[in-house]
């Protein structure tokens, strides 16, 4: 098989796994992948996941990969809060939550961090369209906040929560308090309820 044949078949997927390759060509020689990576014709994303280097220049594609290389997962926590303008800092890692174990990956597209949650807490995310028509799974602002408070329990006092420097205008004018309350109830966590109460007190919600 030539690289051109391989690229023609798989390029539109954006990123792909070795399983997808074998589903297409059961007798595929995986040594080809090693050679093509060395030549710069492919990018290794993590074990058994790959992409074409042309996608390095595409907007939002680094976030799209986050959904694909560790599933099920959705983007949340600091990356989502930064996207919505709730926190002022630019986020280096692309942060997600998943029902799989906590993990971190690095590749040419960036650094990916996944925090583990129970399967019953995999809700509160929506498909967000990308420029090229693909979609990626992204937490709502309310779920991103609750995921953060749930997974980082040291945010339990006013001093710690104030260090997040959440945007006051967003908190008071755009945050959906009804949705926040609904999501909070689904966690069934007294500790999270206490942390959320402190947060609401700070921002007079």
Across the structure, where does each feature detected by a protein language model lie?
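A residue-level signal for beta-strand positions that form part of recognition/binding surfaces
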Residues: 15, 111, 163
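Short beta-edge/loop segments at beta->alpha junctions of small alpha/beta modules
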Residues: 1-72, 108
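A short, terminal or domain-edge coil/loop segment
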Residues: 15-17, 94-108, 142-156
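Short coil/loop linkers at secondary-structure junctions
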Residues: 27-29, 87, 190
